[in-house]
Amino acid sequence: MEKKKMSLPVQIVLALILGIVVGLIFYFIGKPEITTNYFKPFGTIFVNLLKFIVVPVVLLSMIDGIISMGDMKKVGSVGWKTVAYFLVTTAAACVIGLVFANLFNNAGWFPTLALEDGAVWDKATSANFMDTLVAIFPSNMWKSFTDANMLQVIVIALMFGGGILAAGEKGKLAKDLVSTLYAVIERVMAFIIALSPIGVFTMMAWVVATQGPEILGSLAVVLGCAYLGYIVHAVLCYSFSAKAFAGISPFTFFEKASPAMIFAFTSTSSAATIPLSKECADELGAESDVSSFVIPLGATINMDGTAIYQCVATIFLATCCGMTLTLGQMVTIVVTATLASIGTAGTPGAGMIMLAMVLEAMNIPVDMIMIIYGIDRLFDMGRTCLNITGDISCACCVTEWESKKAAQTAK
């Protein structure tokens, strides 16, 4: 009898648990430098491989999706529906984040912490919306690739995909080339993803060994508040919208989306999760051409998890400063956070940049970010998981909307 192979999601979860245990052991024996010298390098190799494959995956999957649609009108239709879905859910995420943050704060559960001496946030990393709008149009295609500027990569994919469709029969060779290259990239990505248990184990062991149990400490309540927001948003917005618009039960939705959710949680990379997210979306009934377009786009612009995080963090940091925010200021947070999610889309460290924008809008010292900066990876695991869950839900909903539109047109 052939022994059944352990599934990748199970391997990743076991690697996560084992990494925490090993990390705690090295922390308590006072040898965290062992994980820094001998564990972290392997985790870094895994992260480098993820970064290496992100650009070709996004570029080729989007071009392939556009070509598969066969009509630029459908591309436009799918595009605006996708962006609208993400804007609505991002606004909802902000409201959920604020509700839970205020509940926790009014209950006196948020600790009042002080900024450590010498801790300074580099404001130079902030960017405004208009700067980003100009920057999404590339002046040098190769620089966009080498800098991994994902918004520029998406624009390049839209232009080449549209150009191939417009070329008609003359573009057949280009279509075949894209399909072939995408098939190869999928195989390479599968190989890299297969290494994820090693990457997860080594990185978690290093983080826990160097930070210790106090990586949570007094910030555990803030972390718990954010994760409660993540869970409620996933259930209320994503699973319910999948049920209402695509006829998928919440249980089925989470069951079939779980492989991508687990991988995103441990890798903290939406872009690296694209192949798994697409596979999960297709299994839930999304059309392949729609998911090929929606998933890469969502991996770049869907930042619902980040929106919840920054609302919780803003209320918490305001409390640390002794400030009490008014209802009007909270409405400003919702608007600022929603617009910031567009303005910083595809920017490395976007979560922190968005938070800096919101804090500046609230006149809260931006340097206060440094209070929670140390455990940002723990916040990031949850928000990345939530973001890709939204991508999958969106692909299913847009597929259903396009199907209904096609049915009405056919009448």
Show where each model-derived region lies.
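Residue-level signature of catalytic and energy-coupling elements of molecular machines
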Residues: 7, 46, 75, 145, ...
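Helix-loop-helix junctions within the multi-pass membrane cores of secondary transporters/permeases
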Residues: 259-341, 395, 405-411
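Transmembrane helix-bundle signature of multi-pass membrane transporters/permeases
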Residues: 45, 63, 82-87, 159, ...
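Transmembrane alpha-helical segments and their short flanking loops
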Residues: 311-411
